[in-house]
């Protein structure tokens, strides 16, 4: 039987009694954000709104974005990425499970030196895809042009964030490239790999 989102006790400052809030609301108060699904407009708007609100509330405390995502839509993902660069606090990115496609793009978009992968996490990069088979001829041409622009944008961001030459990133994105946490670190997508059973980083 589904139990829904777990609830945890939370005590507001100055109040004696605790109230029960869902676990994500409680974690948001600690500036911990979660992308645990495919990227779409709804989750993009939620994360953008949270980052902006938390930045207004306190622009000196870092934000932490935990990622376990198979990827998703390009434009909503770019909206999250741009917001991460725009808000004053540094945004740490943490890969747990899988960061694929747009998930890996957002992982790389964290503050450089503050991007982390758990030891058994997987990362995958590839070029943006499209639903060409649904388009008419004229739409196909326009969509192809737009897709090329998006691919160039994403490739340049990867090159900037990883320190790899543009041609290396371009070749890597020709196909699905899966990486372990240490391979993602060598590739420049993350800066640190968490060490098991300790609070330290490698």
From Swiss-Prot:
Its EC number is 3.4.21.92. Its main location: plastid. GO terms for cellular component: chloroplast stroma; endopeptidase Clp complex. One of its GO terms (molecular function) is ATPase binding. It comes from the Eukaryota. It is an enzyme of class 3 (hydrolase). It is found in: Plastid, Chloroplast stroma. It holds the Pfam family CLP_protease. Belongs to the peptidase S14 family. Component of the chloroplastic Clp protease core complex. This is ATP-dependent Clp protease proteolytic subunit. It comes from Illicium oligandrum (Star anise). The lineage of its organism: Eukaryota, Viridiplantae, Streptophyta, Embryophyta, Tracheophyta.
